[in-house]
Amino acid sequence: MLMISHIHWYERLWPLGSNGTIVQSNVVNNHTYRAGTGSSLVHLINGQAGNIESHSFTGANEPVLNITAVLDQEHFGFSKLTVVNATAAKWEFIRGVDGQVGDELWMIK
């Protein structure tokens, strides 16, 4: 698997196990994952704060990997984590241009 260490995009991956495969049992739906099970990790990558280098893009012949749930290579923005209680947290990607939620993920235990 190719890993890029410095990107300017927002990406949310499906819950991944130690072998790099998606742990389907931890996917409740597109916007809710089970966390804290010990079988997978939640990966949230936000390089969208913005800078003079602009965004990073996948190559024309480089498909988005099946481990990627959401990929935004267009908007700048920031992330907001809200811990609701001991068993639920909400992650939001907020677009800088209009303050709208570009992505949302609930993590439940």
Model-derived segments and spans:
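Short, charged/polar low-complexity linear motifs in solvent-exposed/disordered segments
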Residues: V28-N29, M107-K109
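Long, structured stretches of catalytic cores involved in phosphate-ester chemistry, encompassing
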Residues: M1-E92
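Short, solvent-exposed aromatic-acidic interface loops
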Residues: E92-V101
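Membrane-interface soluble catalytic domains
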Residues: Q100-I108
